[in-house]
Amino acid sequence: MQIMLCAISNIASGNCSEDCKYCTQSAHVKTDIQKYRRKELSQIVLEAKMAKKNEALGFCLVTAGLGLDDEKLEYVCEAAKAVQKEAPNLLLIACNGMASVEQLKELKKAGIFSYNHNLESSKEFFPQICTTHTWESRFQTNLNAKEAGLMLCCGGIYGMGESEEDRLSFRKSLQELQPFSTPINFFIANENLKLQVPRLSVDEALKIVRDTKEALPQSVVMVAGGREVVLRERQYEIFQAGAGAIVIGDYLTTKGEEPSQDIIKLKEMGFTFASECH
């Protein structure tokens, strides 16, 4: 079985104006995460080269904050061009919050392949986890990305206290968007966050993967944050459940599995890694 590996680079971290209860980058909570306005382009390129060396096909440029402004747009475009020059053949993904069709077209011109903007959860549950912007504004940004001609990467976070009905509603909204790829994150509580809920069980997490693939058979299901912590020694069962991709290395503010360990284990299990997107 061939699977897709993706890596992320947090190129602008922390001090986010939004009050998302699940996020340690929010300025509304005190955490000990690294905070910086801009990562040096040379460091981004270094991370991209390392991602490519570690068999990654996708490389995501992530910025904290509500959305794109002119300055941030220019910076992301600069980063995309720098990565393309030094680490060609990576599929570049941008994750920069709310964005207009015009802004997204500029990202596409700079070499961005796909735009990631997660709905996070259902329309009904979202007001319980964020009050500073609406679920509808997130949905609209996804429509904007499609209109701009970008491939769509849209998913969310499970295990925030949502009901099974919320999960069904969430997946129905994803069906409306029909994303190219859909990330699944499993919520891991942090003592500084307002959101404190029991961790998902392994069986429940694997069921979420199965249900997502069933709802979105044409989308690449990507298991991202929380994979190692929630699924532990059973984490590679996600592929039997329908996943076709994982995020390797570190996440936005938390450590992930060492990429080399993932690669060794996956090769031992007979997996190969996609080098192009079909």
Swiss-Prot record:
Keywords associated with the record: 2Fe-2S, 4Fe-4S, Biotin biosynthesis, Iron, Iron-sulfur, Metal-binding, S-adenosyl-L-methionine, Transferase
Q: What class of enzyme is it?
A: transferase
As cofactor, the record names: [4Fe-4S] cluster; [2Fe-2S] cluster
Please name the SMART domains in this protein's record. BATS (SM00876), Elp3 (SM00729)
Q: Does the keyword Ion transport apply?
A: no
What Pfam families would the database entry show?
BATS (PF06968), Radical_SAM (PF04055)
Under catalytic activity, the entry for this protein gives:
(4R,5S)-dethiobiotin + (sulfur carrier)-SH + 2 reduced [2Fe-2S]-[ferredoxin] + 2 S-adenosyl-L-methionine = (sulfur carrier)-H + biotin + 2 5'-deoxyadenosine + 2 L-methionine + 2 oxidized [2Fe-2S]-[ferredoxin]
InterPro entries the record matches: Aldolase_TIM, BATS_dom, Biotin_synth/BioAB, Biotin_synthase, Elp3/MiaA/NifB-like_rSAM, rSAM
- Can you tell me which residues the record assigns to a coiled coil? none
Q: What is a single molecular function from GO for this protein?
A: 4 iron, 4 sulfur cluster binding
Q: Where does [2Fe-2S] cluster bind?
A: 60, 95, 153
- Annotated [4Fe-4S] cluster binding lies at 16, 20, 23
Q: In which pathway does it act?
A: Cofactor biosynthesis; biotin biosynthesis; biotin from 7,8-diaminononanoate: step 2/2
Subunit annotation: Homodimer.
The job of this chain, per UniProt, is described as: Catalyzes the conversion of dethiobiotin (DTB) to biotin by the insertion of a sulfur atom into dethiobiotin via a radical-based mechanism.
NCBIfam families of this UniProt entry? bioB, PRK08508.1
Q: Which family does it belong to?
A: Belongs to the radical SAM superfamily. Biotin synthase family.
Q: What is this protein called?
A: Biotin synthase
